[in-house]
Each structure stands twice: as C-alpha cells, then as structure tokens.
Amino acid sequence: MNKALSVENLGFYYQAENFLFQQLNFDLNKGDILAVLGQNGCGKSTLLDLLLGIHRPIQGKIEVYQSIGFVPQFFSSPFAYSVLDIVLMGRSTHINTFAKPKSHDYQVAMQALDYLNLTHLAKREFTSLSGGQRQLILIARAIASECKLILLDEPTSALDLANQDIVLSLLIDLAQSQNMTVVFTTHQPNQVVAIANKTLLLNKQNFKFGETRNILTSENLTALFHLPMFEQQAQYKESFFTHFVPLYKTLLK
C-alpha cells in the first residue's frame, strides 16, 4: 500500500456547532510533503492534534497507515536534559514503561544525531542551544522514533533565514531519501513553494487541497490572507523559480 494518511469528511469544533473546519478531505501517499497553510487561529495546530489522536473528530474519520513522529513548535523542560536525553525520548514507544534505554536505543539516537551532523552536541544541555539547534534536535528525536510520518508545527517560526533553509532542506531529504511522509504547518507561502508537492489551504470552514502548483495561486492566497499577493518569477544562476510577494498597506501610503 502506498497510502500514508486519509482524512474523510473531517469536522471539529471547540464550541458546539461553531465548526473550526467541516467536511475536510485529503489523502497523502508515502513520500508526500504536505504544507498546511493558513492564518493564525485557522486550525492548523488543531488539525495536527487530530492526526495525533489528541482530539477526536466530531465528524468523519482519520486513517493513518504509518507510525507518527511529532515536532512541536516549542519545547521546554524544567530539567537539565542533555541533547542525547532529548533524542532518546523518541525511543519511548520502543521501551517498556520504567525500563532503561538499551544499547540499541542509544545507537539509534546517535544515528539520528549523525544524520543531522549533530553528534558533537550529544552531551550539551538542551537549553543551552540556539533556537535553530533546538529545532533540529527535536527533528532528530522524531527520527529516532523510527516514524514514517512526521508532523511539524510551524518548524521554522522562530528561526532566522539560514536556519529555515537548513530545516526545509532536511524535510526534503527525509521525503526523498527515507520515503518519509511530511506534514508541516506554516503561514509562509514561499516555504510551501520551496518544498511541498501537496498543499492544504485552511480558511475557516473553507479549504482547498491539491498539488501545490494548482493550489498556490495569487487569487487563492489573496483570499486566504485578505492581502493582495503577487506571483513573481525569479532567476538564480540557471534556475528559475516562483515566489509570492504581499502588497502591504503601508507601502501604499
């Protein structure tokens, strides 16, 4: 089976009958990268919670065909965990309750760090790291869980441009080299253009899902963000690419 995830007629609300979204449908195959794009408060994080089973659908159903790993937008702890401790948390589903990690678990955790070229940070205290390093460590934790479907909640929101590029490149590599299915939330259209082959636009109870090249248009983005969005073609060396530019009201003054 090539299918990774199926969402059928999904409906959910926090307050009775005030649906956050309704009759939401989409399917993903193994190796797909789905960007969930929308304004703050549109339900992006709630959708991830539903996929994780934290919330139960009010309507419809969700079928997950792969093991799930999750990378939260923020992670904090009152304890002085080392980087290796954090990555080992990804092994929790493979370790019996109250049992200590085995040598194989340490090996898998170090392999996850090695995959990201971060083994030199293994003994560092997690809270001493930069925002970009912390985000990569949380991705390493998900990789150590040996998941095949990784969900990321705005993984670049606190990162500078250089670290955003590192994370986005990593997600492409996970999909292409590991055949991992990737779902990430964002409110940045140009990140969607850069890496996602599938896009889900969430706009209150309205949604659009499909191939990114068909969904990500100036018309759809303008309706989504209530701000004029212009599509532009650019060139870097011999490569041509599309990006979107917002027309901020302050520019018209």
Swiss-Prot record:
Topology of the protein relative to the lipid bilayer: Peripheral membrane protein
Reactions that this protein is recorded to catalyse: molybdate(out) + ATP + H2O = molybdate(in) + ADP + phosphate + H(+)
SUPFAM superfamilies in alphabetical order: P-loop containing nucleoside triphosphate hydrolases (SSF52540)
GO MF term list: ABC-type molybdate transporter activity; ATP binding; ATP hydrolysis activity; ATPase-coupled transmembrane transporter activity
UniProt-annotated location(s): Cell inner membrane
Enzyme Commission code(s) on record: 7.3.2.5
Domain ABC transporter: 5-229
Regulation: The MolBCA complex shows a decrease in affinity in the presence of increasing concentrations of substrate and nucleotide.
Family matches, as Pfam families: ABC_tran (PF00005)
Record-listed ATP binding positions: G38, Q39, N40, G41, C42, G43, K44, S45
InterPro entries (UniProt xref): AAA+_ATPase, ABC_transporter-like_ATP-bd, ABC_transporter-like_CS, Metal_Ion_Import_ABC, P-loop_NTPase
Gene Ontology CC terms: ATP-binding cassette (ABC) transporter complex
Keyword annotations: ATP-binding, Cell inner membrane, Cell membrane, Ion transport, Membrane, Molybdenum, Nucleotide-binding, Translocase, Transport
Protein function: Part of the ABC transporter complex MolBCA involved in molybdate import. Responsible for energy coupling to the transport system. Functions as a low-affinity molybdate transporter.
Protein family membership: Belongs to the ABC transporter superfamily.
Quaternary structure and partners: The complex is composed of two ATP-binding proteins (MolC), two transmembrane proteins (MolB) and a solute-binding protein (MolA).
Domain remark from Swiss-Prot or TrEMBL: The transition from the outward-facing to the inward-facing conformation is realized through the asymmetric motion of individual subunits of the transporter. Nucleotide binding is coupled to a conformational shift at the periplasmic gate. This shift is akin to unlocking a swinging door: allowing just enough space for molybdate to slip into the cell. The lower cytoplasmic gate, identified as gate I, remains open throughout the MolBC-A mechanism, and cytoplasmic gate II closes in the presence of nucleotide.
Name used for this protein in its record: Molybdate import ATP-binding protein MolC
Lineage, highest ranks first: Bacteria, Pseudomonadati, Pseudomonadota, Gammaproteobacteria, Pasteurellales
